[in-house]
Regions:
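N-terminal nucleophile
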Residues: 1-163
Length: 163
């Protein structure tokens, strides 16, 4: 493939080919998987695509440079508040993990492990890769601090006039 657009099309076509029996209407029956495909081809910008079971795909909006698979109602508000085109990679990484923690705490159908990969622009290798479980000390510490910070913030608000 010469660019990530072709890669996304290829992943979508493979998904259709291997997940739908011949003759089945793929517009009404979803048997495939959803993928996030991203990375960089040397000499080109970084790209990110969400590939749907039907084979079609989308790119993130410039103002919201992230994509989410699956249950979005719990962790996405955190991403919406923090992730911008200018956010630092470390902050984006912590935000992604806290977003995932919110989903884990709110939806029993979502669970570990969490596969977490960091790729840095123009490096052409994975900078960091972890498989996190709930007993991971760093992840547990981060999520505990987040919970404490939320409570501290809530307790710092002035009383409501009817209290």
């Amino acid at each position: 493939c010469e660019d990530f657009d072709q890669i996304a099309k290829y992943v979508g076509s493979l998904n259709l080919k291997h997940s739908s029996p011949k003759g089945m209407n793929t517009d009404t029956v979803l048997l495939g998987s959803t993928f996030i495909v991203g990375g960089q081809i040397k000499g080109q910008p970084m790209e990110l695509f969400l590939v749907y079971p039907q084979g079609n795909y989308i790119k993130p909006a410039d103002s919201k440079p992230y994509l989410v698979i699956g249950e979005v109602k719990y962790g996405k508000p955190i991403l919406d508040r923090v992730i911008t085109p200018d956010v630092k990679l470390g902050d984006a990484s912590r935000c992604a993990l806290i977003s995932m923690d919110s989903t884990l705490k709110s939806d029993l159908t979502v669970g570990p492990p969490i596969d977490f990969v960091v790729y840095k622009k123009d490096q052409f290798k994975i900078a960091s890769q972890k498989c996190l479980n709930l007993n991971d000390k760093e992840f547990s510490s981060m999520t505990n601090e987040w919970s404490e910070g939320i409570l501290k913030g809530l307790n710092s608000f002035p009383s409501i006039d009817w209290e």
